[in-house]
């Protein structure tokens, strides 16, 4: 690698370098900041993420870096912006709640920055080795974050479960990568696609593909690799759960799209069957398993499993319309989920106790009409009721599936959506038609800002959907 190519590579990966250097600097600042360490480091972490985002949007060009292992293209840029917005939002949500959520440690924002760095590298990965390294960087930070509340048995259990199952999924994925490398002789996505076109598929290669897809399905908590999700969502502190539900899902879906559309495009018939099965299983389990839930964080866990199933409908189509649908679905899903978790974080009694039961929302329309109204809008949107953003998200992926002649998949998706609407409507019924059980403490300004903006986005998507759709189409065109 010459000096010129190295400089060009560094310029393309500047947002990632900003996060890497920023994380190391924040660690040093945290050590020497004394009692004010957590708010100081959290504020600076938000600033680092914003600087990286601005550099990404305004300065970063397009092209390959580090010998083709890193790729900067419109798709990567769009998904990186989503991941950064998710991370910044979670940081803002935790500013006033670190102590009450018992995550009052300066390492927390540093670990979130490192996890975000892993996400950005993952989205730009164009090689199996760079994919694995970035995935592990993200995962190792998240294992610690899940168990960061050492005084809570639930949090420690969540971290341990996530670590054991995450290590297993990483091992499966690595084994799949070794099979793909063994049968093609390459680790780069473009070279793998070229080898598959020239030589055709073999049984060993299909096994490798299955193991890689299984590892990534774990990261997006798709069935049958979803077992960790309800326990980790319930056990981890609420800001951590909000983080899990946003950025990492965006990054994992992004690399899943890049692998199947780019590297394994010549064997579309093989991976399409796998994606269709995972999608149907996730939609059905997400819809039916959530019906009996009494804890709102567990409900959101099953909701996220179902939503990943809907997102995979677009990927199964394998077309430009399908990829565009996936991109828009992840954008809308992230906004709805972060808004909902801001409301969950605001579920705090006057005595300071955080509550998570759906029944604790009883009579919220009388005690906090603004929060009840926003949460109602978000629940309707998650259920896919028109004309809210959630309806358009599902519409785009179902239309792509119909255009790809996957009629059965689209029909099952619509039916699962109808079943799923029940448990969202149950939350609305509890808020508006039951007597209050007590008032929540005054909602913090940053939480009101987050769920207010997300409610506004969901309501106003019908007006701003055009430019977002154009941007998503430009990102999807990267592959076609």
From Swiss-Prot:
InterPro entries: NADH-Q_OxRdtase_suN/2, ND/Mrp_TM. The gene is nuoN1. This is NADH-quinone oxidoreductase subunit N 1. One of its GO terms (molecular function) is NADH dehydrogenase (ubiquinone) activity. NDH-1 shuttles electrons from NADH, via FMN and iron-sulfur (Fe-S) centers, to quinones in the respiratory chain. The immediate electron acceptor for the enzyme in this species is believed to be ubiquinone. Couples the redox reaction to proton translocation (for every two electrons transferred, four hydrogen ions are translocated across the cytoplasmic membrane), and thus conserves the redox energy in a proton gradient. It is an enzyme of class 7 (translocase). Keywords: Cell inner membrane, Cell membrane, Membrane, NAD, Quinone, Translocase, Transmembrane, Transmembrane helix, Transport, Ubiquinone. It is a multi-pass membrane protein. Its EC number is 7.1.1.-. Its main location: membrane. It holds the Pfam family Proton_antipo_M. HAMAP family: NDH1_NuoN_1.
């Amino acid at each position: 690698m010459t000096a010129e190519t190295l400089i060009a590579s560094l310029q393309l990966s500047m947002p990632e370098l900003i996060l890497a250097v920023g994380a190391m600097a924040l660690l040093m600042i945290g050590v020497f900041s004394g009692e004010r360490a957590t708010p100081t480091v959290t504020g600076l972490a938000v600033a680092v993420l914003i600087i990286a985002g601005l550099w990404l949007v305004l300065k970063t060009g397009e092209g390959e870096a580090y010998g083709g292992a890193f790729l900067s293209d419109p798709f990567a840029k769009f998904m990186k912006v989503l991941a950064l917005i998710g991370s910044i939002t979670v940081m803002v949500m935790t500013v006033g709640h670190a102590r009450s959520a018992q995550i009052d440690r300066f390492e927390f924002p540093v670990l979130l920055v490192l996890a975000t760095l892993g996400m950005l590298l993952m989205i730009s990965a164009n090689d199996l080795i760079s994919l694995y390294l970035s995935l592990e960087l993200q995962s190792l930070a998240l294992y610690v974050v899940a168990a960061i509340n050492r005084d809570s048995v639930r949090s420690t259990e969540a971290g341990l479960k996530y670590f054991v199952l995450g290590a297993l999924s990483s091992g499966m994925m690595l084994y799949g990568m070794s099979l793909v490398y063994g049968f093609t002789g390459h680790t780069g996505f473009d070279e793998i696609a070229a080898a598959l076109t020239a030589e055709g598929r073999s049984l060993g290669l299909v096994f490798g593909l299955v193991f890689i897809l299984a590892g990534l399905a774990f990261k997006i908590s798709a069935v049958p690799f979803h077992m960790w999700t309800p326990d980790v969502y319930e056990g981890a502190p609420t800001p951590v759960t909000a983080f899990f539900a946003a950025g990492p899902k965006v990054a994992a879906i992004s690399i899943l799209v890049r692998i199947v559309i780019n590297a394994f495009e010549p064997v579309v018939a093989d991976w399409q069957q796998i994606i269709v099965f995972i999608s149907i299983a996730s939609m059905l389990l997400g819809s039916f398993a959530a019906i009996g839930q009494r804890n709102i964080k567990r409900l959101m866990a099953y909701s996220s499993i179902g939503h990943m199933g809907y997102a995979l409908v677009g990927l199964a189509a394998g077309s430009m319309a399908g990829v565009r649908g996936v991109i828009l679905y992840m954008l809308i899903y992230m906004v709805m989920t972060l808004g909902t978790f801001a409301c969950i974080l605001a579920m705090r009694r006057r005595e300071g106790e955080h509550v998570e039961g759906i029944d604790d929302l009883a009579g919220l329309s009388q005690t906090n009409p603004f929060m009840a109204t926003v949460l109602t809008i978000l629940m309707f949107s998650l259920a896919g009721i028109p004309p809210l953003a959630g309806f358009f998200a599902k519409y785009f992926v179902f239309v792509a599936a119909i255009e790809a002649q996957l009629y059965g998949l689209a029909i099952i998706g619509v039916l699962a959506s109808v079943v799923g609407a029940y448990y969202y409507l149950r939350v609305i019924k509890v808020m508006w038609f039951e007597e209050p059980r007590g008032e929540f403490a005054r909602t913090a300004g940053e939480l009101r800002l987050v769920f207010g903006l997300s409610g506004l986005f969901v309501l106003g998507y019908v007006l701003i959907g055009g430019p977002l759709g154009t941007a998503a189409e430009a990102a999807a065109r990267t592959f076609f």
